[in-house]
Amino acid sequence: MRSEKHLPPLPLLLAICCLGTLHPSSGFPQSVPSYMEALDIPESEKLAFCFSQWTALPDQEQIPSFVMDLCSSIYNRMKVNEENNHEIYKRFLFQFSRTKDPSLKTGESQIATAEYTKRDSSGIVGRPFFLFRPRNGRKVSINEH
């Protein structure tokens, strides 16, 4: 058995590095508004919102091109991962939402049903015995059910 280490996801590490290279005086918003935390918004949209706020500020320093390239690649990677996860989830739901037909419709299934159907003393066909099989050797009459 291999012991696996739980490492943070790569896009999160890159986003932290990207945000760490920015100067506090650059005008980047220091905190996400409280209404954003309460909503169920994907991480890529939160990241895009923060970058759009930062780039819209007029008094910011010039953004190095490699930082913007890095941030855009992180954003694109996160978006692709979210789309893939959504597709996998849809396929999973579709696979298990379909009703399954019995695998044996005729032939062996009819023979097996006939073998398990018992007749009572008057010769009337009863229900399959495995549905009403008594436990501990006791006999159960059909009238009790």
Curated annotation (Swiss-Prot):
Keywords: Amidation, Secreted, Signal. Transmembrane segments: none annotated. GO terms for cellular component: extracellular region. It is found in: Secreted. Belongs to the NmU family. Expressed by the skin glands. Isoform 6 encodes peptide NmS-33, at positions 92 to 124, as a result of splicing out of an exon that encodes a processing site which generates NmS-17. Similar 33-mers and 36-mers have been isolated from human and from mouse and rat, respectively, although they do not arise by alternative splicing. The lineage of its organism: Eukaryota, Metazoa, Chordata, Craniata, Vertebrata. Residues 28-89, 92-117, 140-145 form a propeptide. It comes from Bombina orientalis (Oriental fire-bellied toad). The modification Asparagine amide is found at residue 136. Its main location: secreted. Residues 1-27 form the signal peptide. This is Neuromedin-S.
